[in-house]
Amino acid sequence: MSDQKLSVNEYLKTDSNYLRGTIEEGLDTSLTGAFNDADQQLIKFHGFYQQDDRDLRNERKEQKLEPLYSFMLRARVAGGVCTPKQWLGVDKIASTLTSSNSIRLTTRQTFQYHGIPKRNLKTLIQDLDREALDSIAACGDVNRNVMCNPNPVESKLHQQAYYWAKKLSDNYLPRTKAYAEIWLGDDKVAVSESEEVEPVYGKTYLPRKFKMAVAVPPDNDVDVYTNDLGFIAVAEDGELVGFNMVAGGGMGSTHGEVATFPRLGDDFGFIKAEDCLKFAEAVLKVQRDWGNRSDRKQSRLKYTIVKHGFEAFKAEVEQRAGVKFEPKREVVIGDRGDRYGWIKGVDNNWHLTLFIEGGRIKDLPGQPLQTGLREIALVHKGDFRMTANQNIIIAGVAEEDKAQIEALARSHGLMGKLISPTRGHSIACVALPTCALAMAEAERYFPDFMTKVEALQEKHGFLEQPIVIRMTGCPNGCARPFAAEIGLVGKAPGRYNLYLGASFEGTRLNKLYRENIQEAEILAALDELFARYVKEREAGETFGNFTVRVGVVKAVIDAAKDFHG
């Protein structure tokens, strides 16, 4: 590949001195609340994005002011596990260093802050560091936060799976000292041209973002097939023996560009647990060397596999790993939702899953959620565990402490509200007003929209049955809308593309049903489909499977050919 073909980002990475760029100079500049264009790309590797308040954009323009710039910072928390002490630190940061005064749980089992002024960035990162937390590689062209079923004390198998998720996270962190130098005040280290700073990533890192997940069947809460690389735990007599490996998933696409599409990962076969890191590193290095560095819209692993072919990619991974895949083991992939309320673990401790609407932890009228979790953290002796459905688990509660934890949860509006199965299975991205890519609302609008969907379900007599519904403000797919039975993807203010037909378990994508429609049209379409579903469904048939069986949409078997066709 010639230099002329490289995307701008590749030059930026090459010239960045291993992600340093001119970030420090940008921090010292008080003339603007922003970083320059090049550093805006590099700061992603440090865990944050530059944003502005889009609700105020026109008003500030009229006042001849620059946009109200702020930053969204995402933490790296493998498997979503943190201690009560860490949670108190996370909470204090939200209350003192951000304008949103909130904590946002993400669809990848971590938390993020919105509304951070540039002047607060260094203090915030240093405060996180004091809690043994960081934001390294939470964004950027690297392996991002590794997901795992969030309750590793539910069984021995969960503990073993979490161990490997943590190893995957730690092993594939960038090795550059840029983060420590810029944010934590570590001594600067001169880097020679011959020095191998990044043994896995190299000087230009990966062509694009890379996402990993570890699933523990029958749960598929981590949506393992939507990841670049997924490991599905295989057990014998309750002990982890290895994983079925899947690779090539990814949700992002671009409206109107048929060369871009979401995709679910391919099944590659079974690997022994002790070979997990060999295969992970092999996949990363093949993607590093084979991935498209010219067109970032074609740079994800899914396009690399489609371009080179499954068999060629598999053979290269085996060659680099030095181990061959065994035939895939049979496992059952089931529910993607969280189990709300109390669950008892094998160690006789209890785990309380709390529903957090939109993942937004903030004190609301009659629901002081943030205060409630703070009060719980002050007395809780176990862990906090964030889920891929934007919820939180108070894990490791002793029998004698249950009543106190439940009383705190109920008195602060964290328990007691009846949640329908569909609402409990549904998620939305942040979108407006902070996300620069959003074309329509998601988080702010989704609760009211879900109330209207619930009314339709009640009208047709199946409110007790869950449907996986997801909404995003754009087609980048942060809330994994293309793997939802009903997916709504923002097209313009108040307008969405409506997708139908994904499987309930997350093993089949959905397909476009109606394009660029408003709420009234969406609800009318669902009203009609719900009526048909109740009359024509087969025993135990999920809504997504029904829409495919009766021909409302065609099944997506090969995304490269079927998703747009």
Swiss-Prot record:
Catalytic function, reaction form: hydrogen sulfide + 3 NADP(+) + 3 H2O = sulfite + 3 NADPH + 4 H(+)
Annotated positions binding siroheme: 478
EC number(s) stated in the UniProt entry for this protein: 1.8.1.2
Co-factor binding comment: Binds 1 siroheme per subunit.
Self-association state and partner proteins as the record states: Alpha(8)-beta(8). The alpha component is a flavoprotein, the beta component is a hemoprotein.
Species for this entry: Shewanella loihica (strain ATCC BAA-1088 / PV-4)
GO biological process, one term: hydrogen sulfide biosynthetic process
Protein name per the record: Sulfite reductase [NADPH] hemoprotein beta-component
